[in-house]
């Protein structure tokens, strides 16, 4: 009778080093931690990219991209010059100043064509933001 192929010893079994269960538990926990940390909490935002162009005199053009995890009825916007989740109605009606985009002490005015807003500082400096 020929020997059963299942009872024979495998030659490649010793090729892999033995790893303890502690190692695998650590690897699983590390991967879960990485997956958990890459997700935002509901109602929060983070800046992903920020580019500044100061090639023109007396003018700086800044572009930023934010990633938000907004709740139902909210959409990514700006509050106090930071990315934030705001009421979707504000974006639909283009009433930008309703989301309080300017810093405290600054005045907010809509652009004539409602394509953005301006924040006027007490000293007269004006920051213009357009929405794309």
Swiss-Prot record:
Single GO cellular component term: extracellular space
Any one of the GO BP annotations: negative regulation of vascular associated smooth muscle cell proliferation
Keywords tagged on the record: Cytokine, Glycoprotein, Secreted, Signal
Cleavable signal peptide: 1-43
Annotated gene: TAFA5
Record-given protein name: Chemokine-like protein TAFA-5
Tissue: Expressed in the subcutaneous and perirenal adipose tissue (at protein level). Highly expressed in adipose tissue with moderate expression in the brain and ovary. Isoform 2: Brain-specific.
Lineage: Eukaryota, Metazoa, Chordata, Craniata, Vertebrata
One GO molecular-function entry: G protein-coupled receptor binding
Subcellular localization: Secreted
Chief location of this protein within or outside the cell: secreted
Similarity comment text for this entry: Belongs to the TAFA family.
Known role: Acts as a chemokine-like protein by regulating cell proliferation and migration through activation of G protein-coupled receptors (GPCRs), such as S1PR2 and FPR2. Stimulates chemotactic migration of macrophages mediated by the MAPK3/ERK1 and AKT1 pathway. Blocks TNFSF11/RANKL-induced osteoclast formation from macrophages by inhibiting up-regulation of osteoclast fusogenic and differentiation genes. Stimulation of macrophage migration and inhibition of osteoclast formation is mediated via GPCR FPR2.
Carbohydrate-modified residues: 113
